[in-house]
UniProtKB/Swiss-Prot annotation:
Species of the source: Danio rerio (Zebrafish)
Keywords noted in UniProt: Developmental protein, DNA-binding, Homeobox, Nucleus, Transcription, Transcription regulation
SUPFAM superfamilies in alphabetical order: Homeodomain-like
Residues annotated to bind DNA: 145-204
Protein name listed in UniProt: Homeobox protein Hox-B8b
Length: 247
């Protein structure tokens, strides 16, 4: 029974015609085993491809010798022989060589990139500058412009007077501490002490401000003695006037 099954298969599928290379839709150039012309089994089977003898004329004269009807009706691509593929690859190689061998100035496929870059540059140049907020202390001061007078509050004046009575000359470290404590600048504290020393010299009729605390205490003592003498003098005059009036 098995031999019957095998024989039926062999009689149904023959080895010569059924195993041809052009059985599928896309035929290759490999000549068929039977030596017969290729037969297409696609949807366009009206006309068959030409014999292999016409290939030399086709590749010798160019693409114009290719049959127009076969080109339109053949559904699949045609496989070319070895020499034909060599010619085609050679032409592609020449085209690639001429393409890559051209100078950079001849390339126009990247022109749009240059246009985009130039457009971005124009946009950046035409953009308005950023207007940042400027505070009064950030603006440059003119040379001929006169500064306004600084007004001190009662608390600031009281603290500065206390510091002046303790020490009329401030060190740099102490001046920084006072300026931070009173919310003033070092320059403002320095100017206030200079003006205060000038005022003291006018009040005491001195050409020079005492450089030490001892000198300042001595001056204060003399001032107190002078005030006491003047008071005694005025009181004596009043007593003499009162005695003369009683007489």
């Amino acid at each position: 029974m098995s031999s019957y099954f095998v024989n039926s298969l062999f009689t149904k599928f023959k080895g010569g015609d059924s195993l041809r290379s052009n059985y599928y839709d896309c035929p290759s150039y490999t000549p068929d085993l039977g030596g017969r012309p290729s037969v297409l089994y696609g949807h366009n089977t009206g006309s068959a491809f030409q014999h292999a003898a016409q290939f030399p004329d086709f590749y010798h004269h160019g693409t114009s010798s290719f049959p127009h009807a076969s080109y339109q009706q053949t559904p699949c691509a045609v496989a070319y022989p070895g020499d034909a593929t060599g010619n085609i690859l050679g032409q592609d190689g020449l085209q690639k060589q001429s393409f890559f061998g051209a100078p950079d100035s001849d390339f126009t496929q990247f022109g749009d990139c240059n246009l985009k870059v130039s457009g971005i540059r124009d946009d950046l140049e035409s953009a308005e500058p950023c207007t940042a907020q400027l505070f009064p202390w950030m603006r440059p001061q003119a040379t001929g412009r006169r500064r306004g007078r600084q007004t001190y509050s009662r608390y600031q004046t009281l603290e500065l007077e206390k510091e002046f009575l303790f020490n009329p000359y401030l060190t740099r470290k102490r001046r920084i501490e006072v300026s931070h404590a009173l919310a003033l600048t070092e320059r403002q504290v320095k100017i206030w002490f200079q003006n205060r020393r000038m005022k003291w010299k006018k009040e005491h009729n001195k050409d020079k401000f005492p450089s030490s605390k001892a000198e300042q205490e001595e001056i204060e003592r003399e001032r107190q003695e002078g005030s006491q003498v003047s008071e005694k003098h005025t009181s004596g005059e009043e007593d003499s006037e009162a005695s003369s009036n009683s007489k």
